[in-house]
Swiss-Prot record:
Gene3D superfamilies noted in UniProt: Integrase, C-terminal domain superfamily, retroviral, Ribonuclease H-like superfamily/Ribonuclease H
UniProt-recorded name of the protein: Gag-Pol polyprotein
Residues the record lists as binding Mg(2+): 12
Species of origin: Human immunodeficiency virus type 1 group M subtype D (isolate Z6) (HIV-1)
PROSITE patterns: INTEGRASE, INTEGRASE_DBD
PTM entry text: Specific enzymatic cleavages by the viral protease yield mature proteins.
Domain Integrase catalytic: 1-64
Enzyme Commission code(s) on record: 2.7.7.-, 3.1.-.-
Keywords: AIDS, DNA integration, DNA recombination, DNA-binding, Endonuclease, Eukaryotic host gene expression shutoff by virus, Eukaryotic host translation shutoff by virus, Host gene expression shutoff by virus, Host-virus interaction, Hydrolase, Lipid-binding, Magnesium, Metal-binding, Nuclease, Nucleotidyltransferase, Transferase, Viral genome integration, Virus entry into host cell
Gene name of the encoded protein: gag-pol
Domain of life: Viruses
Length: 148
């Protein structure tokens, strides 16, 4: 282990804190091993303070939960990026679009049409997968003629 005086101070501070907690809980535990486990638990989950008033254990759990939520949201975003939306406004029978799908919920979708962001009921929306330019009509016709 490389010499690092700052980390040595952190370790010494933690040892001092754990010794203090062990002194408080020693009479409640039959074995020293149990007292050490109790002290570590108390230090990680019961002592609040620092960032946001969380305990150390709550902070790490919050970090992990946030990371999982971020990954799930990124998955959902990549799923709906390739969709185009055609929609109708109120009583106007003419379909408008294509607009970019931002969010798809149970009863409504959020779309971006030019710079406008709108919430439209699902019943007034047609969601179509955008296959990109490789499926454009002229290219398909040309490739089919080449196959014959």
């Amino acid at each position: 282990i490389p010499y690092n005086p700052q980390s040595q101070g952190v370790v010494e501070s933690m040892n001092k804190e754990l010794k203090k907690i062990i002194g408080q809980v020693r009479d409640q535990a039959e074995h020293l091993k149990t007292a050490v486990q109790m002290a570590v638990f108390i230090h990680n989950f019961k002592r609040k303070g620092g960032i946001g008033g969380y305990s150390a254990g709550e902070r790490i759990i919050d970090i992990i939960a946030t990371d999982i939520q971020t990954k799930e949201l990124q998955k959902q975003i990549t799923k709906i990026q390739n969709f185009r939306v055609y929609y109708r406004d109120s009583r106007d029978p003419i379909w408008k679009g294509p607009a970019k799908l931002l969010w798809k919920g149970e009863g409504a979708v959020v779309i971006q049409d030019n710079s406008d962001i709108k919430v439209v009921p699902r019943r007034k929306v047609k969601i179509i997968r955008d296959y990109g330019k490789q499926m454009a009509g002229d290219d398909c016709v040309a490739s089919r003629q080449d196959e014959d």
